[in-house]
């Protein structure tokens, strides 16, 4: 009953307006406001500040600045093996596996189509997926899972439902309904996509090459082509791609048939850390 009420209230909320108001508050550099919000978040979400590069909350310019805090150097070691695909984020590996009949698993008993997720019928190259949920207590920066060159970025406006366990089990096609930013890369295994999925109270998605995109800033699908010679934007495995200004979800899509996950496919909701081995590229 409580779960259904939580979902019902989300249908009533003005998603974009709510998230933009949160963004204004979270960007405030008023010391009293931002310090209070940071202390409240640390207590509410049990945030481990010991891992942060900066542990003095007074040094953060705003609540958002705190939420995208950096980790201490070498805290998340990464494999140098080119055949290892690394986790792009701290969080929970909620679902992963093979894309079958153009469908991905959202939650137990719930599927959604790849075509609806990327808003394109050109889906034939993607064969595997992994979904990582970032809770408010997690590190919020997203890193490159494999060496690659940025070829395209697509912004898709949408709803801003919460993406927690309750909502993913109750709302059909959740990740295809929510706002999302899809980043395409050319890699040694072919094309991959790293998808930033927006959510309720997420005050924006940012990438290191484009900057911030506020919740539903664009009313229509937007595409940026980075494939021309004048861009040549390359990333090494482990490089920072961008971040969420609150908890949300990252989905990785990979091509080909030579990717094998490090975990048993009948398991889910596995705690994972950024740079941890996620999958192997087999011969």
Swiss-Prot record:
PTM annotation: Is synthesized initially as an inactive proenzyme. Formation of the active enzyme involves a self-maturation process in which the active site pyruvoyl group is generated from an internal serine residue via an autocatalytic post-translational modification. Two non-identical subunits are generated from the proenzyme in this reaction, and the pyruvate is formed at the N-terminus of the alpha chain, which is derived from the carboxyl end of the proenzyme.
Localization: Cell membrane
Protein family membership: Belongs to the phosphatidylserine decarboxylase family. PSD-B subfamily. Prokaryotic type I sub-subfamily.
Protein name: Phosphatidylserine decarboxylase proenzyme
Gene expressing this chain: psd
GO terms for cellular component: plasma membrane
UniProt record, GO biological process: phosphatidylethanolamine biosynthetic process
Main localization of the protein described in the UniProt heading: membrane
UniProt cofactor note: Binds 1 pyruvoyl group covalently per subunit.
